[in-house]
Structures are given as structure tokens and as C-alpha cells.
Amino acid sequence: MIGNRLLRKMALALLLGGAALLPHGAHAQGAKAAAESLFQAAKQLMADKKFAAACPKLAESQRLDPSPGTQLNLARCYEGLGKTASAWAEYKGAAVLAHQLGQKDREDGARDLARELEPKLSKLTIVAAATPGLVVKSDGIEIGAASFGTALSVDPGEHVIEASAPGYEPWRVTVTIGPNADAKTASVPVL
């Protein structure tokens, strides 16, 4: 009986250990296939001008199998949604990835598209006085003190700015940023 149990455990260990060696190649192929399926579905959605449905599929395709082509399409999709800062960032990312892969034409094209968007980028500047323990967030993402006073590229729309510090009342404001090079400043009051 003990021998059978030991044999079963050894067989299970070999099976699991061997399985751990397989997923790299098998998983990579599965990820590539899933990425391609998502990409094709997104391309059709974009052709139908359904950008809100297409962009998440492209983002997931890019996560599963990063490529400059997918990233360029994601940027175009964000442009279709009016998310100029997101599109600009994806174009710049696609240029970097294309450069790393030696795809000069794609690199140049992505850089040109990013450059074309730059004059249209809307900006948000957050100004805050030094308060011990101050934490400032924009749309839930912490903004470091080095960013204070710098015009940051943001997508048009509403942005929630929050500030808090130990021993102080938290502060919150919603700033609406328009398209086409709108610029707004959110001034965090002394808490």
C-alpha cells in the first residue's frame, strides 16, 4: 500500500514537473493565437467605428503579444475615441518598440503620427503647496511632487483631483478638460 501511494506521488510530481516545462512554448503560442483573434475582432470593430469596444481588445492583444502594429492600431483607436493623450503615448510607445525590432518605417511613421498630435494635446497642471505627508491623485493615480507645476498631457474629459495629508481635511475637485489643446490648472489649497 505504501509503495502504491509513493508511486502515485512520484508520478504526480513528474507530471506536474513536466507540465511546468511545457507552458512556455505552448502558452506563448496560445497567447499569440488569442492576441491575433482579439486583433482581428478589434479591426472589424474599428472598421464599424465601434472604437469603445475595439480599444480594450487591442490593449489586451498588445498585452498578450506586444507588437508595433497592434500598438499603432491601439493609438488609432484611442484617436477615434478622442483620447488624444492616450493615442500620443501609444504612438510614442510603438515608435520605441519598432526601433527595438529594427522596423524603421514603422518607427518613423509612429513618430510622425505622435508629432502630428502634439499640437492638439490638452494639458492639466496641478499646483500644490508643500504640506507634510501630502498625497495628490489625479483620477486615482498618485502624482509625485516633481509633477507639480508641470503641464501634463491628459485626455479630454473630466478628471478628479484629490489631495490628502495626515491631520488635514481631504480636498477634491473635478476639472473638465476640453479637446484641441485645452489647458487647465488645478490649484490644491493649503490643507
Where is each model-derived feature located?
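Acidic, Pro/Ser/Gly/Ala-rich intrinsically disordered segments
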Residues: 1-191
